[in-house]
């Protein structure tokens, strides 16, 4: 286990360089996640014979990716970043991938911000093309979880979002301190386990939009659990009743998904 515990000391976050441009493993994992999500979406469209045109699907993923990036970055700046006012007064720096002339990529993304950007992009896309947003949302619920696994692996390889201090034998040393590899816990619970739940729910689906609500509930619950092993966000710490900001946002997300599900399922609300 010694090699594993000291993996960060033996691993370079930079995969390779092209003409002086450093390509990080995180970026590679992010691209893999995007491609996998699209491929899975096309697979599920065929498998479940969904009424979605492939050309529309390709366009939709472009819209969604833009929404996700904007939402994730802005969400991080507004919720987590200690330099919020700096970015508000210097908006051109929000997506600046350089620090002191060195390319480091765009760092600082919020999953919950990404969700908001994703929903806005979906609604705008479906309004423009006059399509049912719930069909696309349910498809995303099936396609994203397994792709999400690579995103969390990217966090692990990038040596960020590490866990709390521990003494478990599978912990990893971060700056000389043994910590939980919480990114991998998240990859498993928020990715693989959530996918299994949503996939099984597909065979008992009773209304359009049910899968995205199941996903929201399952993800938020998994994230809430994982936050117990993840180091609270720097500069924020524990926010309320010993909970991290991630747990508070996940709790809100879970309650929202549950209420919408109950209203639709049992109150026969039309969507």
UniProtKB/Swiss-Prot annotation:
A 1,2-diacyl-sn-glycero-3-phospho-(1'-sn-glycerol) binds at residue 152. This is Phosphatidylglycerol--prolipoprotein diacylglyceryl transferase. InterPro entries: Lgt. One of its GO terms (cellular component) is plasma membrane. The chain crosses the membrane at residues 25-45, 60-80, 103-123, 134-154, 181-201, 209-229, 235-255. PROSITE patterns: LGT (PS01311). PANTHER family: PHOSPHATIDYLGLYCEROL--PROLIPOPROTEIN DIACYLGLYCERYL TRANSFERASE, PROLIPOPROTEIN DIACYLGLYCERYL TRANSFERASE. Pfam families: LGT (PF01790). Its EC number is 2.5.1.145. HAMAP family: Lgt. One of its GO terms (molecular function) is phosphatidylglycerol-prolipoprotein diacylglyceryl transferase activity. Belongs to the Lgt family. Pathway: Protein modification; lipoprotein biosynthesis (diacylglyceryl transfer). Keywords: Cell inner membrane, Cell membrane, Membrane, Transferase, Transmembrane, Transmembrane helix. It is an enzyme of class 2 (transferase). It is found in: Cell inner membrane. The gene is lgt. Catalyzes the transfer of the diacylglyceryl group from phosphatidylglycerol to the sulfhydryl group of the N-terminal cysteine of a prolipoprotein, the first step in the formation of mature lipoproteins. It is a multi-pass membrane protein.
